[in-house]
Amino acid sequence: MPRKGYIAKREILPDPIYKNRVLTKFINQIMLDGKKGTAESICYNAFELIQEKTGKDPIEVFETALKNVMPVLEVKARRVGGANYQVPIEVRADRRQTLGLRWLVGYARKRSEKTMEERIAGELMDAANNTGGSIKKKEDTHKMAEANKAFAHYRW
């Protein structure tokens, strides 16, 4: 932990096309090796694919997908008297969003479609419909928290 207090969070600029800050975070999550232009083109092409396939506004699909993927509870390891307990805790709003974005991109990368645009589009559409890998991850996280509810009194 820092001794001189906490560092202020950097302000994230909204993306150039949709003027959305959360979308900028999503693009940053897609980005590899600092290639932001490539990440932006992947994201915007994926949004065009979503527009073609669903006929809905891609930003709405993205926001619905993110809302469906964001976890409410997670478990954190806590050592008590020589034993490690998985203690369920509520997820802070900023971490909830970060985890949702990370899971969406992570499970999109694991998909079998040919291009990254197709993978991102597929994962976003699946998550908006409450299916797909990222939704399964959220459900597994919630199941773990539910299974370890008995240790909730170890919260700190």
Swiss-Prot record:
One of its GO terms (molecular function) is rRNA binding. InterPro entries: Ribosomal_uS7, Ribosomal_uS7_bac/org-type, Ribosomal_uS7_CS, Ribosomal_uS7_dom, Ribosomal_uS7_dom_sf. GO terms for biological process: translation. It comes from Desulfitobacterium hafniense (strain Y51). This is Small ribosomal subunit protein uS7. Part of the 30S ribosomal subunit. Contacts proteins S9 and S11. Coiled coil: none annotated. Pfam families: Ribosomal_S7. It comes from the Bacteria. PANTHER family: RIBOSOMAL PROTEIN S7. GO terms for cellular component: small ribosomal subunit. One of the primary rRNA binding proteins, it binds directly to 16S rRNA where it nucleates assembly of the head domain of the 30S subunit. Is located at the subunit interface close to the decoding center, probably blocks exit of the E-site tRNA. PROSITE patterns: RIBOSOMAL_S7. Gene3D superfamilies: Ribosomal protein S7 domain. Belongs to the universal ribosomal protein uS7 family. Keywords: Ribonucleoprotein, Ribosomal protein, RNA-binding, rRNA-binding, tRNA-binding.
